[in-house]
């Protein structure tokens, strides 16, 4: 009788390429042959192709979701004839602490780039770890001096696919504690360096996550002392910030009030932005026709909805508001927190044209300071080189 381990390598690879991501850990623990095969680059290419094929054909969308300071792989179905559904498929391959091998369940922020995740823990001193969920590989990043609560980060790569981390510190609204620092970490050299050519006349709010696209990171930024808003991009090849990039609207931000602006991506080539005015509650979703570190063109208003027709106080939180676009159904799904209930609830709002609106309760959020974050996910073939 033929057993799995006796099958030809090509056939075995074809079978294992269809295994869901959340089951790969069990596959790898079965035997050394399967473990080695699952980490082979040719196998991984098949896995990525299969994953993308399933995403195109399936009515369900698989995303990474952060809730209650943990990271999950979640299936979202908004194409059924009843109500949209959000089904957790389980945690991705466990993120563990190298020091004690305990599972890390205190992730306060997540930054995504090309299948890799940069996670910031909410420990007393804050820690950074880069994680490839597919391989289960991690690298804990030691600070040059120390990390701070209001630090902002970006994960990207240069033209040679060398990954780097940008750390931003700018306490614009705390002049007595004013610190402006920009540091860059290289995976190749395992070291930080100060980005010396930066003296910005703009600032990025600490809760602004930014958006990684084609290796570079884009943020919504505002000029200091003046209500002028725009996008700013950090190019990980030149290791510099580019020029101000236009937005298709004018937003307002101050210590007392602010509009909501968040970024997302459409596929691997387009940038999308959500804008909601605090005064009118009108929500706009725009998509780029061209996006580079030095040029952005907007030519498509994907969706415009008057949310005041739904509720006179329906405004997304500036700290939340992560979203994605479903082009098949022509809707946008926005993730937020409902803080009006007796308990905080993580919510998803499915909004479309002609008054289409669905509200989905994802579940209770145990922590007031944790906001739901969602990003699309495809496995990365980038292996994180372990430090010796």
From Swiss-Prot:
Matching InterPro entries: F-box-assoc_dom_typ1, F-box-assoc_interact_dom, F-box-like_dom_sf, F-box_dom, Gal_Oxase/kelch_b-propeller, SCF_F-box_component
Cystines in this chain: none
Gene3D superfamilies the UniProt entry points to: 1.20.1280.50
Pfam families to which the protein is assigned, alphabetical: F-box (PF00646), FBA_1 (PF07734)
Residue stretches spanning the membrane: none
Residue ranges of every copy of the F-box domain listed in the record: 1-47
Name this protein carries in UniProt: F-box protein At5g42460
Originating species: Arabidopsis thaliana (Mouse-ear cress)
């Amino acid at each position: 009788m033929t057993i799995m381990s006796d099958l030809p390598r090509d056939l075995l690879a074809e079978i294992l390429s269809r295994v869901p991501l959340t089951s790969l850990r069990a596959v790898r623990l079965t035997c050394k042959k399967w473990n080695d095969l699952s980490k082979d680059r040719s196998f991984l290419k098949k896995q990525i192709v299969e994953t993308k094929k399933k995403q195109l054909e399936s009515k369900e969308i698989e995303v990474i979701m952060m809730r209650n300071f943990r990271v999950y792989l979640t299936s979202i179905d908004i194409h059924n004839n009843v109500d949209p559904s959000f089904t957790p498929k389980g945690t991705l391959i466990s993120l563990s602490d190298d020091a004690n091998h305990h599972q890390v369940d205190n992730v306060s922020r997540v930054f995504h780039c090309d299948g890799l995740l940069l996670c910031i823990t909410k420990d007393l001193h804050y820690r950074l770890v880069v994680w490839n969920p597919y391989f289960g590989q991690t690298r804990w990043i030691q600070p040059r001096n120390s990390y701070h609560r209001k630090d902002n980060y970006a994960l990207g790569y240069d033209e040679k696919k060398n990954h780097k981390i940008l750390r931003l510190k700018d306490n614009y609204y705390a002049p007595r504690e004013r610190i402006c620092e920009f540091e860059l970490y290289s995976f190749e050299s395992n070291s930080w360096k100060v980005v010396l050519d930066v003296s910005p006349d703009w600032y990025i709010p600490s809760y602004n996550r930014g958006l990684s696209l084609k290796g570079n990171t884009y943020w919504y930024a505002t000029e200091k002392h003046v209500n002028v808003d725009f996008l700013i991009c950090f190019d990980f090849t030149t290791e510099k910030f580019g020029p101000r990039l236009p937005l298709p609207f004018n937003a307002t931000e101050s210590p007392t009030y602010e509009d909501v602006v968040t970024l997302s991506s459409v596929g691997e080539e387009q940038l999308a932005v959500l804008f909601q005015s605090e005064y009118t509650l009108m929500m706009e979703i725009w998509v780029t026709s061209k996006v580079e570190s030095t040029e952005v063109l907007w030519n498509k208003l994907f969706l415009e909805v008057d949310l005041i027709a739904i509720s006179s106080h329906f405004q997304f939180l500036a700290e939340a508001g992560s979203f994605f676009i479903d082009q098949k159904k022509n809707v946008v799904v926005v993730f937020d927190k409902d803080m009006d209930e007796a308990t905080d609830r993580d919510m998803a709002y499915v909004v479309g044209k002609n008054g289409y609106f669905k509200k989905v309760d994802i579940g209770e959020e145990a922590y007031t300071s944790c906001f739901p974050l969602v990003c699309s996910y495809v496995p990365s073939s980038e292996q994180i080189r372990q430090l010796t």
